């Protein structure tokens, strides 16, 4: 009889366990999208950042250019064109006028021309002023934006105060009411106390 009772209990337990469905939950850190930051799965932001870095590495650098600066304002564009004409026709040229001087940018198909221009005109005197000629590597727009964003982020972090604080600490301000209370709470002079004591004694 005991054996039969055990079989009945066992069968009922088996039936209940077979009918019971086990609900599987995702890990909470994955549900809350904390998994990528903990190293369980790649995040979209990290993937985009990596893709951008790969694109920047795959993109070839821009051709080098020549920059002529500290040109007097009274030097005409035709004079500058005549100076460069002997080295060939540039494929890119741009002139910037500032308050004090002018600056020219040139790009040539043959990069060897740049060295010749530097040797020829660096320190050259033009209208009683010495001009400067140098070769530089231009940057792409997204590279300049990334550098600007990094500088901006650094400035914001420095303006927040000490690490761990969300806002910059502000000096304690005393309201007008508190100021009035402070004035009323100031101790009176000895003469005033004596006068009050005399009035009290006479009364």
UniProtKB/Swiss-Prot annotation:
Compartments (UniProt record): Nucleus
Pfam families for the chain: FoP_duplication (PF13865), RRM_1 (PF00076)
One annotated Gene Ontology cellular component of this protein: nucleus
Ranges of residues in domain RRM: 64-138
Main location class: nucleus
Keyword Nucleus in record: yes
GO BP terms: mRNA transport
Superkingdom per UniProt: Eukaryota
Segments of this protein annotated with the region Disordered: 1-60, 134-203
Annotated Basic residues bias: 139-153, 163-180
Keywords: Acetylation, DNA-binding, mRNA transport, Nucleus, RNA-binding, Transport
Bias kind Polar residues: ranges: 11-20
Record PTM N-acetylmethionine, positions in chain: 1
Residue spans of biased composition, Basic and acidic residues class: 47-60
GO MF term list: DNA binding; RNA binding
Quaternary data: Associates with mRNPs. Interacts with YRA1.
Family label: Belongs to the YRA1 family.
Cited function: Involved in export of poly(A) mRNAs from the nucleus. Recruited to the coding sequences as well as poly-A sites of active genes.
Name recorded for this polypeptide: RNA annealing protein YRA2
Species annotation: Saccharomyces cerevisiae (strain RM11-1a)
Organism lineage string: Eukaryota, Fungi, Dikarya, Ascomycota, Saccharomycotina
């Amino acid at each position: 009889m005991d054996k039969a009772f055990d079989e009945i209990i066992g069968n009922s337990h088996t039936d209940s366990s077979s009918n019971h469905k086990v609900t599987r939950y995702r890990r909470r850190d994955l549900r809350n999208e904390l998994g990528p930051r903990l190293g369980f799965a790649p995040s979209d932001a990290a993937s985009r950042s990596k893709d951008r870095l790969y694109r920047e590495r795959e993109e070839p650098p821009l051709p080098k250019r020549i920059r002529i600066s500290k040109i007097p304002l009274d030097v005409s564009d035709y004079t500058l064109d005549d100076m460069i004409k002997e080295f060939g026709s540039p494929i890119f040229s741009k002139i910037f006028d500032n308050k004090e001087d002018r600056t020219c940018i040139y790009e040539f198909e043959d990069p060897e021309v740049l060295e010749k221009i530097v040797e020829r005109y660096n320190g050259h005197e033009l209208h009683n002023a010495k001009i400067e000629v140098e070769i530089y590597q231009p940057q792409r727009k997204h590279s300049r934006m990334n550098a600007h964003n990094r500088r901006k982020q650094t400035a914001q972090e420095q303006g927040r105060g000490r690490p761990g604080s969300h806002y910059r600490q502000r000096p304690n301000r005393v309201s007008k009411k508190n100021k009035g209370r402070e004035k009323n709470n100031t101790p009176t002079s000895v003469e005033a106390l004596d006068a009050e004591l005399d009035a009290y004694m006479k009364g």
